[in-house]
Amino acid sequence: NTMRAFQSLGVRIDESAEELRIYGKGLWGLTEPSGPIDCGNSGTGIRLLTGLLAGQDFFTVLTGDESIRRRPMGRIVKPLREMGATIAGRKGGELAPLAVTGSRLRAINYTSPVASAQIKSALLLAALFAEGTTRVTEPRLSRDHTERLFQSFGIALRREGSTLLIDGHPSVGWSAAPRLVVPGDFSAAAFFIVGATIIPGSDVTIQQVGVNPTRTGLLDVLTRMGADIQLLNQREEAGEPVADIRVRSARLRGVAVGPDLIPQTIDEFPILCV
């Protein structure tokens, strides 16, 4: 869905069995799509695209499947409107489809009510098109994939405690990454990690998994429960920590999971309950 969305915005993407070749068009190079962009079941996709398109000089409609059209969008629409974005949607912009009319954006100081990488990332993308320095403050650190990717492309970010600062209209420092290797998804690996932990006699190694510390709360919880988990061959790819995860079966004990671990464990709670 993300690839089709950018193709509809005029980006050339060549796909082969093992890689995508993307021909960048620069900050202002996207073009108005001929119809609505369908984000399917991707909440991340529709929210990040809303931020990206808020500063463009054309009109876009973003929609998704039935479940996406029921999910709340107000948490990104409200701060984007504060930046000057023109966004309309069902229930005053609370629900998709969202109609985004590109506008001249201005920097804001925004304090997010929740630790949300989707809110943060939508605002960081919009901030690239805004006049001035945008500040985004979170109550706790959320996933930082966007910040790491920005920095790998030479986009300057600064952190002051729980606040991120980014300057709009960056004119220097950009660099095209000749090759990005996307590590294995930790949420997908979580099922094998738990399975190997609870099935007697297991000894499993899962290779090339992203182990970003803002994503791996499950490892912290399982280790406290007595799991036998090792991170091998640790390295960094495109700013992201990567490792091979070796898991051997172990007897576990119950633990209490506090609010400090919720953001980095949220997607793994169903399998953690097993």
Give the residues covered by each predicted segment.
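Structural preference for solvent-exposed beta-strand-turn elements
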Residues: 1-274
